[in-house]
């Protein structure tokens, strides 16, 4: 048994383990920020629904749909719990829904740009970033 465990541990590459942990953390961060931004946009436009349901939180457990998360790892796509929005609170419901829907993807774009800038700083002394 001990020999088996030693073989298993030697086969583990700590770099790939760290890579997997960072990927999972990035997924949790992106899903959480994405859904929170939907709620913040709705709140800014007059809809308190997400706030009253405690969904304006950076706590990933409030936003993660466990089946959607599993699908993300198994199939390469997934989802989170959608933030509830009531368009009746918006002065212009169609425009409010469009802006609220746009807030999530915009947050993903901003996070991607930040990640790119951080990686440029980290790998500044290298010739290329992969």
What are these model-derived regions, one by one?
Residues 1-130:
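Hydrophobic transmembrane alpha-helices and their immediate loop junctions
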